[in-house]
Amino acid sequence: MNKFLKWAVLPTMILGLFTVTSCSSDDDDSGQKNVTMKVGDTYTIKSGSNWSVDNEYVAEITGSTIKATLVGEATVSNGTSSFKLTVDPKTILWKDPYMKWNASKSQVKTAMSKYELLTENDDQLIYNGKDKADYYGYQFQNGKLYSSMVFTSYLEDEFNDFLKERFILIGSNDETLTIYFTDYSMKYIVIAMFTEIEDVPYCIVGYGDASEVNSMAQTMKSEFINLKPYIAESIKNGDIKVGNANVREVKAKILETLK
């Protein structure tokens, strides 16, 4: 199945923009074994036949062999038996931002209590990041969370793997240097927006409800403008590595590996 082409059924609003190495199991209520895998791993079902999976993005089944292909959850069944399949990522660059849409600002602050709050206004929270996340950003409408963002200068091959393990490619826009994704459940949209500061290619990864895709893109641009002085200062201080790559080349390379 061509998973990219299958997205022709997406709403026009979105399209217009653009051998197991580790496996665990536990019993569910029906006595079946639930399975947890990592992307790229395989697992052989010990008994039964005619197995199928209800989400072909998360896993593929050939005979009795499951291959995990995308982070998410699915149900594997053969008409008489079933079990839950959970696929976890292999590549972890940062902790996922808080993504409970419509949460209050106080709820986000509680969830981010271990991170340093950098700046705050009525519609926005920005935190210093950890690991490969330089910053986290949260945007609010009428006091409710509608978009979460991660700002990163880490655009090595691992970044490609990070995206590919978690998200389904929808499309891209060369003019705005953006790549659009969704998750396995198709409940939220992910936008990778590329830019350049002090000759350093930079990316903002924005997460939000699929219905907010248009306003998300504008919000990401706004948050980037607010953070630009902090990012530039980090580059001058040597906290962010300076590279020679052109941002358009970086974006094109990442997009090619995702197809």
What name fits each language-model region?
Residues M1-T42:
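Bacterial Sec-dependent N-terminal signal peptides
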Residues S25-T42, I61, T69-V71, S77-I170, ...:
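Short helix/turn-capping signatures at newly exposed starts of structured segments
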Residues S77, A192-E198:
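Short, exposed beta-strand-loop hairpins at the edges of beta-sheets
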Residues N142-S147, M186, E196-V200:
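Coil-to-beta-strand transition motifs
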Residues E165-I189:
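Short Gly/Thr-rich strand-loop-strand
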Residues D199-S215:
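Short, hydrophobic/proline-enriched secondary-structure or compact coil segments at domain edges
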